[in-house]
Structures are given as C-alpha cells and as structure tokens.
Swiss-Prot record:
GO CC terms of this entry: chloroplast; endoplasmic reticulum
Protein name: Beta-amylase 6
Main location, first listed in the record: cytoplasm
Alphabetical keyword list: Carbohydrate metabolism, Cytoplasm, Glycosidase, Hydrolase, Polysaccharide degradation
Taxon lineage: Eukaryota, Viridiplantae, Streptophyta, Embryophyta, Tracheophyta
PROSITE patterns: BETA_AMYLASE_2
Cell compartment(s), UniProt: Cytoplasm
Residues at which substrate binds: D119, H159, D167, K362, H367, T409, N448, A449, R485
Reaction catalysed by this enzyme: Hydrolysis of (1->4)-alpha-D-glucosidic linkages in polysaccharides so as to remove successive maltose units from the non-reducing ends of the chains
Length: 577
C-alpha cells in the first residue's frame, strides 16, 4: 500500500500537522481541505474537476482539466525584494562602492530574490535648487540592477534619513527647503512644547505656496513627474515595477509622534504633532464652526515617554479620548492625515497613469500599547484605532480609491518577543491591518520592522504572507514582501543559508519565476483613481470586523538546523566538484 506521506511532495511535509498516534493528520476543516488538495497531486500534476455544459444531474463521465503541480503552487508564490542600503547613493549624489554592490547583487540574484527596493532621496536629487533634478547616479544604479535581472521598487523619499530606528546615515531634505524653514519654522511638525521636527514637512503646508511659488504637494508632484520622465526606459522595460509614495516620516503615512531625535524611547506613547500655527489655526476654526470655541489642542496627553494610564488624556476609564472633546480632536487629527495621503496619492496616480507598475504607500506597525483600551501610541501617530473603532479601514479604502498597494510593517514580530510592560500586540495588529486591506479588495504587501536573521522571525513572516497556508486558490496571500535590509551580516553564513531557505518557502517551494503573470502578478497600465466615494464616507465606516482566519504557525516553516544542513551540503558539493 502506498504511504500517504509518499504521495505528498516532500517539500510540503511539516510536522505540525501530524497528530501523534494517527495516520491521518487533520486538525480542522480548513486543514483537511488543504491536505486533500495536496493528496490529489500525483506524478507531478493536479486534476481539477470542471463542470460540463450538461446538467450536473446527468451521470456522465467526469471531465477534468489537468493543471501542472507547479502552476497550482505558483498561485501561492510571494515575491521577495531586498532593501538596498540607505546610503547607496551618497549625499553628494554619487554611487559609491559600485564593485562591492555588484558582488552583493550577484549574490542576491543567485539566491533567487525577485528584486530590490531603493530610497530615491528628495534631499539628494533636488538639492541644488527648485526643479534642479539630478538623476544620473540613480540611473547608473538602476542600470546595474537591471543588468542582474532584478526588479526594482522605488521609494519617493520626501523625508530625512536619520533619526529613525535603523538609520545609519544622515540625508536631510533639500537645503533650500530647510532655509525656508529657518524663517518660517511652522512648515515643520511641532509638538506642544514647540519643538520642531525637520524630518519632513508638516501636512499643514500641503496646499500653501510657501516654497518659491509652489505648495508642498506641487513639489512632490513635480519630483515624481521628473522621475517618470527620466526613468521612462526603466519603467517601459519592466524593471521598475513599484513606486512607493512617501507620505511622512520614514516614508510612512503617519505623524512623527515617536522620533528618537526628540528623545523618544520605546515604548513611549509619543506626542501629538499638530501645534504649528497652520494646524493650530485649522483646529480653532473647526471648533468654532461646531460651536465649541473653548476646546483646545490637547495639553494633557503626556510626553514622548509617558505611559497611557499616567496621562489625563489616555487614562483608561475616564480619559479625554473617551469624551466628546477628545473624540472630536482625534477625528480631526486622523482626518487631516487621511486627506494628506489621499491628495498625494491622487497626484501620484496622475503622474504614473498608464504606466505598467503599481503605486504603494506604507503604514507603520505601531504595536506597542495595542493591548490597552486607549491604543495611545497609535492615536498620537494619527491612527484612530480603538477596540470599538477600526482606524485602518479608511486607510485601506483610500488605497483602493487610487489602485494602490497597502504596505505594512512589523510582519516578523510575535507578541512573546515584546516586553510585557509595552502591552504590545504585533500579531493582532498585523491581522487587523492585512484583513482590512483584503476586505477592501486591495493588494497588501509588507516589510520587517527590524533586521532579523533567525528562522523564528522568518517563519512568522511566512505565516503572515499566507495566513491560511498553501491552498488551491492561493488566497489570502500578500502581494509581496520586502526584506530590511541588505548588509554584510545578511550575506554571511549561516545567515545567508537561512535567508535562502526563507526565500524558497515564500516562493511556495518553487524556483524563482520570471513570469509574474504565472503567479497572478501581471502588471497592467495604472488606471485613474476612483471618485465614487468621499473621504467623509470613509471616515464613517469604522465598525470593527473580525480578522481573516489565521493559522497558529505556518505550514511551510523553516525547521531547526535545516539551513545549517543545507549549508553543509552545499559546502560538501562545492568541495567535491
């Protein structure tokens, strides 16, 4: 009798599904369906039942459509990209260490990585003056990436590098913009103490002509337009497949509420960033309009490193956030952020309209204090998310409006890895945000928030990339994953062998696929943004929903010592040859 395990592809066997003392490893209904699907694979092909034109009641011979095992598995393929170093292009707009980079890219290509991601720094390209764009160094970089057959995700980085976790270089926003800020510091985000954050421009100046006759949004638009014009060959040839639009600090759609340059230390709740004169004036006008001129911007929300329960605003049982005044402020604060993202994504959509690529925007994974009533760290960042109010649905709807991918962070994190005092819930947060995107019918991608080289971190990413494991439909499945970040430590052993094992699992144990349409990633011309729903409608749809079902652990895990054994095997074969 043929063994059940013998019928299965050995690459798919995972001990977590085997129940001791049982010859059949069924954990629940969904697991049973996956197992039955895998058992239908025999001799490299999968037979899928097809309904005939005649009625199903007629007892005629069943017709089958034969699909290859590889084709079916590719529906579960998640492409993986690697972020290049932050300073791969220097402040002087020069591509340094070109030969070293080529060696690294060659190694990445051999590992079967799908592509790379790179920050295209506003502070470098437009440093000489308004509309004086210098793209030569980036063109040189893109040509090298193309020569290795790698795809490219380009970030329109309208923020400063330096001051965020992991920043190892300092690249400010353009000097001529900073000089405008010297005479008008209210162009920058400001906390209640009056401290300015020069990491990026405040959303309050999006539509103010303060920058040599242009608004902030017009500067972002012109920059993206120049990028498209100067990189047309890389776009049309399919090298550049993704434009991530910077929308705030670290390129993320949020306020700079937890900046290390301001003294923030994890897990501080952060501070609201709406005290520049433009946002202050806007709020005062809004409260007068609704008949509450006595309402002021919060002065009782603590400081960067406060604990929620120690503040009057975030106090769990009777905090300001629970009252009418607090609710109005948080609605206004989050709405300003949504308007900001909506407007810039609309400009990006117009700039890249018709291009065969995706646009994307990143949302920060603020997981600390998630398991408290007030979600204080999320609120100060602009995500109005509570137990009875979903703060991510509106963001997902904005992405849907502009045909954009929602890119989320902290996919590698587990609750048990976080300090108890932080009340963190990265697993629940990831499930909530990804589910919000999938429920809206948009593509969702992700990143790790911190560098990881261990199988536990990788296994958590694999789980979040395919929450229900490998299955016939491949859904739900993340559109892609970008690994943070290329380094010598990643490329050294045994880390690199573990990373290659991770790539294999993300690719559903298939070889690198150069034809995206085979895993349902065909790039079509970008369509114009939808305008069938207003932002006000988005803001009203805040009812929480249960997240999609999620396995406890991935069905394609990297097992203990697996990468080490792979390394020993490859070393042995190399020496033997």
């Amino acid at each position: 009798m043929t063994s059940v395990l013998g019928m299965m592809n050995p690459n798919l066997i995972n001990g977590r599904n085997l129940h001791k003392g049982s010859s059949i490893f069924v954990q629940d209904k969904e697991t049973k369906k996956r197992v039955q699907w895998r058992l239908s694979i025999k001799e490299g092909s999968l037979r899928t039942h097809q309904a005939t034109a005649s009625s199903a009641t007629e007892p005629k011979a069943t017709e089958f459509n034969t699909t290859t095992y590889e084709d079916k598995m590719l529906t579960n393929y998640v492409p993986v990209y690697v972020m290049l170093q932050l300073g791969v292009i220097t402040n002087d707009n020069v591509l340094e260490n070109e030969e070293s980079l080529k060696k690294q890219l060659k190694k990445l290509k051999q590992s079967q990585v799908d592509g790379v991601m790179v920050d295209v720094w506003w502070g470098i390209v437009e440093s000489k003056g308004p509309k004086q764009y210098q793209w030569s160094a980036y063109r040189n970089l893109f040509a090298i990436v193309q020569s290795f057959g790698l795809k490219l995700q380009a970030i329109m980085s309208f923020h400063r590098c330096g001051g965020n976790i992991g920043d190892d270089v300092n690249i400010p926003i353009p000097k001529w913009v900073l000089e405008i800020g010297d005479s008008n510091p209210d162009i920058f985000y400001t906390n209640k103490s009056g401290n300015r954050n020069k990491e990026c421009l405040s959303l309050s100046v999006d539509n103010l002509s303060l920058f040599r006759g242009r608004t902030a949004v017009e500067m972002y638009r012109d920059y993206m337009k120049s990028f498209r014009e100067n990189m047309e060959d890389f776009i049309s040839s399919g090298v550049i497949i993704d434009i991530e639009v910077g929308l705030g600090p670290a390129g993320e759609l949020r306020y700079p509420s937890y900046s290390e340059t301001q003294g923030w230390v994890f897990p501080g709740i952060g501070e609201f960033q709406c005290y520049d004169k433009y946002l202050r004036s806007d709020y005062e006008e809004e409260v007068r309009r609704i008949g509450h001129p006595e309402w002021k911007l919060p002065e009782n929300a603590g400081e960067y490193n406060s604990v929620p329960g120690e503040t009057e605003f975030f106090e769990y049982s009777n905090g300001t956030y629970l009252k009418e005044e607090g609710n109005f402020f948080l609605s206004w604060y989050s709405k300003k952020l949504l308007l900001h993202g909506d407007q810039i994504l609309d400009e990006a959509n117009k700039v890249f309209l018709g291009c065969k690529l995706k646009i994307a925007a990143k949302v920060s994974g603020i997981h600390w204090w998630y398991k408290t009533e007030s979600h204080a760290a999320e609120l100060t960042a602009g995500y109005y998310n509570l137990k009875n109010r979903d703060g991510y649905r509106a963001i997902a709807k904005i992405m849907r409006r502009h045909h954009a991918i929602l890119n989320f962070t902290c996919l590698e994190m587990k609750n048990t890895e976080q300090p108890a005092k932080a009340k963190s819930g990265p697993q629940e947060l990831v499930q909530q945000v990804l589910s919000s995107g999938w429920r809206e019918g948009i593509e969702v991608a992700g990143e790790n928030a911190l560098p990881r080289f261990d199988r536990n971190g990788y296994n958590q990413i694999i789980l979040n990339a395919r929450p229900n494991g490998v299955n016939q439909d491949g859904k739900p499945r993340m559109f892609g994953f970008t690994y943070l970040r290329l380094s010598d430590k990643l490329l050294n052993e045994p880390n690199f062998s573990t990373f290659k094992m991770f790539l294999k699992r993300m690719h559903a144990n298939q070889e690198y696929c150069s034809e995206p349409e085979r895993y349902n990633h065909e790039l079509l011309p970008l369509e114009r943004s939808r305008n069938d729903e207003s932002l006000e409608m988005f803001m009203e749809e805040t009812e929480p929903f249960d997240p999609f079902p999620w396995l406890d652990e991935t069905d394609m895990s990297i097992r203990p010592f697996e990468s080490v054994l792979s390394l020993l095997r490859s070393t042995f074969l190399r020496k033997k040859s």
